[in-house]
């Protein structure tokens, strides 16, 4: 099992380089991804041990802020967020390896994107370790274009269909349901793919699906960035982007499993919260003007069948 974990780690660290390099090619000023390698000390007072590399870009003309973060951690006991629906895992040691990214563009016409790909092994030090994969990618537009959502979902479907034709409808629905702000009765964006507890096939089959899915993120996102990054925008557009970013913050702090897991398990707070946007605003009881571009967004981000 250790060999398989290391193989996935090697894939993720290479993927991190591929993604940051591809994004930097679209940046028009001197902003670059900065590498912040870290290691948790292996001492008794540390609940979580391990290491990682958080790559951050800030202040770009295209990417106002972005993080592509790798981590490999282990602990003596899974936190409550990981065992709430799987009580049989309570008290088990674990290893978790993953890559998580969030890209916050400066231009309100370029959507925010998020992706995460991970493996968990519970009881890795026992004769019967329990493994599963999780991950996916989702898109959060502020001023949406239907062709962007169609391209995003078509890319997702193509990858899923290559492995299992039941995956796309199942993981799309899961994504729609997961990225939902219950307290607002709003969806975060136009979705994509979300899956967890993936071990329905052999390890190699699941590994191949997850790595193909991870490799397809750039195919899904880069054409949208290239198409929208030079659209002119006004302060009104920027203000609405900042307002909608507030919803992003609310979701990450209240509902996101990865954030909650990281904080509950004693993870590296600076890396966990690096996905937060550089700026966001909240307005009391604000409502978009009827018939405005802003009002249309709320109809657009409801779940729908993007691929006819």
From Swiss-Prot:
What are its cofactors? a divalent metal cation
Q: Which family does it belong to?
A: Belongs to the aerobic coproporphyrinogen-III oxidase family.
Instruction: Provide the residue positions that the database annotates as binding a divalent metal cation.
Output: 104, 114, 153, 183
For this UniProt record, give its keywords in alphabetical order, as a comma-separated list.
Cytoplasm, Heme biosynthesis, Metal-binding, Oxidoreductase, Porphyrin biosynthesis
One of the GO BP terms on file: protoporphyrinogen IX biosynthetic process
Annotated region Important for dimerization: where? 248-283
* InterPro entries, per database record: Coprogen_oxidase_aer (IPR001260), Coprogen_oxidase_aer_sf (IPR036406), Coprogen_oxidase_CS (IPR018375)
Please identify the protein, giving its name as recorded: Oxygen-dependent coproporphyrinogen-III oxidase
What's the subunit arrangement here? Homodimer.
One Gene Ontology cellular component term attached to this UniProt record is:
cytoplasm
Which reaction equation describes what this protein catalyses? coproporphyrinogen III + O2 + 2 H(+) = protoporphyrinogen IX + 2 CO2 + 2 H2O
